[in-house]
Amino acid sequence: MKDLLKFLKQQSKTEEFNGIKIGLASPDLIRSWSFGEVKKPETINYRTFKPEREGLFCARIFGPVKDYECLCGKYKRLKHRGVICEKCGVEVTQTKVRRERMGHIELASPVAHIWFLKSLPSRIGLMLDMTLRDIERVLYFESFVVIEPGMTSLERGQMLTEENYLDALEEYGDEFEAKMGAEAVLELLRAIDLEKEIEQMREELPSINSETRRKKVTKRLKLMEAFHTSGNKPEWMILKVLPVLPPDLRPLVPLDGGRFATSDLNDLYRRVINRNNRLKRLLDLAAPDIIVRNEKRMLQESVDALLDNGRRGRAITGSNKRPLKSLADMIKGKQGRFRQNLLGKRVDYSGRSVITVGPTLRLHQCGLPKKMALELFKPFIYGKLEGRGLATTIKAAKKMVEREVAEVWDVLDEVIREHPVMLNRAPTLHRLGIQAFEPVLIEGKAIQLHPLVCAAYNADFDGDQMAVHVPLTLEAQLEARALMMSTNNILSPANGEPVITPSQDVVLGLYYTSRERINGRGEGMYFMSVAEVEKAYATGAAELHARVKVRITETVIGDNGERTEQRRIVDTTVGRALLSQILPAGLSFDLVNQNMGKKQISKLLNTCYRQLGLKDTVIFADQLMYTGFRYATISGASVGIDDMVIPAEKYTLVADAEAEVLEIQEQFQSGLVTAGERYNKVIDIWASANEKVSKAMMENLSTETVINRDGVEEKQASFNSIYMMADSGARGSAAQIRQLAGMRGLMAKPDGSIIETPIVANFREGLNVLQYFISTHGARKGLADTALKTANSGYLTRRLVDVAQDLVVIEDDCGTHEGLTMKPLIEGGDVVEPLRERVLGRVVAVDVLYPGTEDVLAPRNTLLDEAWCDKLEEHSIDEVIVRSVITCDTDFGVCAACYGRDLARGHLINHGEAIGVVAAQSIGEPGTQLTMRTFHIGGAASRASAENNVQVKNSGSLKLHNAKYVTNTDGKLVIVSRSSELAIIDELGREKERYKVPYGTVLEKLEEAAVEAGDIIANWDPHTHPIITEVAGSIKFVDMIDGVTMTRQTDELTGLSSIVILDVGQRGSAGKEMRPMIRLVGADGSDLMIPGTEVPAQYFLPGSAIVNLDDNAQIAVGDALARIPQESSKTRDITGGLPRVADLFEARKPKEPAILAEISGTISFGKETKGKRRLVITPADGGEQYEEMIPKWRNLNVFEGEKVERGEVIADGPEAAHDILRLRGIHNVANYIVNEVQDVYRLQGVKINDKHIEVIIRQMLRKCVITSAGDSEFLEGEQVEVSRVKIANRDLIEQGKVPATFERELLGITKASLATESFISAASFQETTRVLTEAAVGGKSDNLRGLKENVIVGRLIPAGTGYAYHKTRNDARAKKDEPVVVNKITASEAEQNLADLLNLAGSQD
């Protein structure tokens, strides 16, 4: 019967909803929720264990304790359901209602809601325009507030202390009204007339001049408008009625031994009820004011504690000295409702066990212990047993399974056939942390895992555990098989490279197979086929590494898919010929005819996937693995102590270094070098000695001398096991071998500084006690760092996911013509990332032309795949404008064309792909590999930074970027502009190298001149900053008076005198206003002009400039008038690794940021103040001047009279992303963040596609600030979603009104997550109280657009397979709103549609 009822219950339609609104509850609303008033603080009767009447667990209010049974037991059973017992007043119904029925408490005196009082900015304070301090004094009964001044001189809202109040009473009697406590605040709030206030403020806003006042008024206005539009009333921020949570959500559980465990909420409610009842009694008794006041204050405090304990004053503690957990604590934090129960739940049909290796499995299989499978698939087995007639009832089936009858195992085999299971390893850092496999039943208790998927899971077999989940429904199984099967996840979503590459043993085996040995057994034999090679190897006629000639047959696949066979004879080895047997048809033999290291194998798999597709690759990967394991076993590669060969030269090299160190030590003692220099030099000496030793060691290890067939000695790569492991990329590296057989080298202290005495021993020789002790430092620091790093990296990932979670591909093409310009990344003389890698898989935004013509090479909207990239390289294209998510025009999502290729699938991205989450995971997952340290520049690094020339590495021709220059008397070019760059272009017009050159650089070659590799083409003095003349003439000193603005200094060694300008601070009062400068005059004494302008050629001299010329000296173009000594830049710490990435994504301002020019114009310096210079920029068109005060110690890059462009650097330093966005635009800030983040990852050798970083940047840029409102609803200075403004503007333009203008704003990821439109998503991220308070006051509604909100309300997410469900729902909703239009369709059209559908279905294979 009960089941029948449940069934009937399910038939009733659940409520469909499209959004969730949050608001303030009015007292009447709270009463309407309630099923009765709770009047007593009692919980249950401790003798009978029955709930007390009118108490906190009262059955009359909240419902029966047992299903369909009233409290006194008069009515039992189902037939009475719905009856209310006349004896005990309990409704006969399910006990489940105790989870949903609320009660209420009528408060004897109103109480302020602490969230609206204390959550900053205080809403009550803003509303009343009073300070929080004052309101608190009123609420907690320390002072009076005037409510109704009447005809008196008092003002409404004025604070009165006790004495003032008594004085006023004497003076005015009862003409005025003043109160204290929440009643007073309630009255004040009730008296506010929202519409009138809003009107007033809107009128006075334009006339306000002071910035702070304007901000305050805008804030208040926004709050008032929020209240007004949402229909909330301000007085509802004060509670008159308190709702009571349903009792089953705050349970009271009997423990054994007669004690009870209770939720803290019960204690808190009990306090409130006790105080409320006492207050009622006091009011009835008309007790003295002071007692009532005290009781009211206590009531206020107890309600505060219930809502948010510890927000004000000391937290109320329970019996165990711990603060009680209030309602606010229930929902916030990691253990709160959101993160613990809504976003992550524990699920059934899951198990976990240790993993072991399964080298015999296929890629799509995993070994599942029989015991586990039996438990996981129980319901399926019961069903099958019953269906087969082996068991009559479920109970019998249960018994059979418990006894483990033989038939059960047969049934189990059938049940799991083709039923995929999902394996997950924590921490799941990216989507490859959960994959589906077909289970294979095994004996034992450990799960077997295929070795190739270990890289994706980051799993090893040292005791890792993994969880198994069973997809139950058909849809779930389908998804697991079609999307999550390990065979479908061959490429990494982070960079599009294969993620199932062999590693360790497999690599070693394949490498060993493909090596060649001089004069091996069978060298020089000829074979007619690979089969014959196999025979020769099996019979021992030829060994694995013998160099032989073999005739091979290759399959060549043409462009049209035609397969042709070709035969040729190749020089190869026996092993490589054997490898070619597993090579799939269609791949060239050359791919295995080389030493197969890890990189080569990865490339081989990649090529296979791109050329032959998924299926062949999967089979091939498995074959590679089996082969690799087999030959690794045969090779017998193992490590013995004799494999670590210590080079003989080591001891002489170490002795030389020690002698050098002694010499430096002596120089230091005789005072020739400073302590710092000595330290740096010593470290350099040891570092280079270490390099030399390791070089000798590697040469020693990597080659051996053998006698070839002609009896001559010849060198060949060695078969030393350690060397083979490192060379193949299986395990270990040169740096680790150096510690085994070279010297351990320099060690760092825990604080990061380097200890100057290195460890000269290696592990083979063994360490002495001191050396061992020094080594422990590093090892321990490593462990501590790792722990910190994991936490930090996890937090970064969480913030990234949160900011990007709602970004989904929702349309094919937004049609924008914008894009980012991609060029190869060149740093100095190296191409760090070629153009090919940057544009592969992106869509062209603007036609790419053949160089030097107007013909289109790649039209707009082409998806650049491998073939297209080859074409671009062929025609040496070196910049392409590609579509990017940053410039995508789609509202609330992105389009497929702007995103380009789905990296994990290799084709254009599908609709509904959750690119935001994928991007966040791709950036966050390698986070644990990044370092945590900040790099100190010292020693070798600091000297390298003072370069003074450019030496080219490639020949080509010279090209200058944004450079102004003059030609000096020697015919050489002198650069007279700031951020100039010099590039080397090869004969095809591709940029090969790029260097920054400072002001005053002398170029040895003219522009466009040919240069040879190794030429030095530019020189400058790194220690001084010259001032260079652009005209020739004689010089005139102005305002240069000896002893006032300058002094003469004579160099002791040379006897030359030079003039040094005094700093303003050092001059006497006479020289303060003087501006020393050099004017250039012609032969007739007239002022010369700078060529092409009307500006007289005069050069101001800043403080401490050195002039080596005399008055009236002749000077030529390009000569230095003066030199300004550069203080060697202070050693800046470079933040590296994880902290740097976090800083970039949080868009934090650096400590001393670069100062950029706000407008274009001419520089001049105004009046100086004590510590600052006044920089003035005058625009050329005579607009408004821009002034900025800059601290004196900042090194300026500009001189008086110089022209700057907007966004140019005025003072050096790390650039702030906000400034770049403001002054140089979106494209520049995107490039800056992408390149900076990539630099950090590149240093660790991690590849991440630029797209992912762009996705995050798009989310950081999703807000804008309204600069002028036009005819829109927005307020000036308001922060709004860009897509909102765009939509509003489209409507306004359609109606012919003035659209709003806005400036994009860059928010850090935490700020951006909290500023999202969905309050549910923001609340579940951080600062829950603040977010919810703000949302409630604004009456916000959440349209459940993102992924997180939908997970929280328990729906399918609007991404992936859930995307279609949401799309149909939204279309249905739109249809409901639209007038019905009947769609007519002809038969031929229907036929065509069907054909298209079938074609589509066929193309998905």
UniProtKB/Swiss-Prot annotation:
HAMAP family: RNApol_bact_RpoC (MF_01322). CDD domains: RNAP_beta'_C, RNAP_beta'_N. It is an enzyme of class 2 (transferase). GO terms for cellular component: DNA-directed RNA polymerase complex. Belongs to the RNA polymerase beta' chain family. GO terms for molecular function: DNA binding; DNA-directed RNA polymerase activity; magnesium ion binding; zinc ion binding. NCBIfam families: rpoC_TIGR. Its cofactor is Mg(2+); Zn(2+). This is DNA-directed RNA polymerase subunit beta'. Keywords: DNA-directed RNA polymerase, Magnesium, Metal-binding, Nucleotidyltransferase, Transcription, Transferase, Zinc. Its EC number is 2.7.7.6. It catalyses: RNA(n) + a ribonucleoside 5'-triphosphate = RNA(n+1) + diphosphate. DNA-dependent RNA polymerase catalyzes the transcription of DNA into RNA using the four ribonucleoside triphosphates as substrates. The RNAP catalytic core consists of 2 alpha, 1 beta, 1 beta' and 1 omega subunit. When a sigma factor is associated with the core the holoenzyme is formed, which can initiate transcription. Zn(2+) 1 binds at residues 70, 72, 85, 88. Zn(2+) 2 binds at residues 814, 888, 895, 898. Mg(2+) binds at residues 460, 462, 464. InterPro entries: DNA-dir_RpoC_beta_prime (IPR045867), DNA-dir_RpoC_beta_prime_bact (IPR012754), RNA_pol_asu (IPR000722), RNA_pol_N (IPR006592), RNA_pol_Rpb1_1 (IPR007080), RNA_pol_Rpb1_3 (IPR007066), RNA_pol_Rpb1_3_sf (IPR042102), RNA_pol_Rpb1_4 (IPR007083). Binds 1 Mg(2+) ion per subunit. Binds 2 Zn(2+) ions per subunit. Signal peptide: none annotated. GO terms for biological process: DNA-templated transcription.
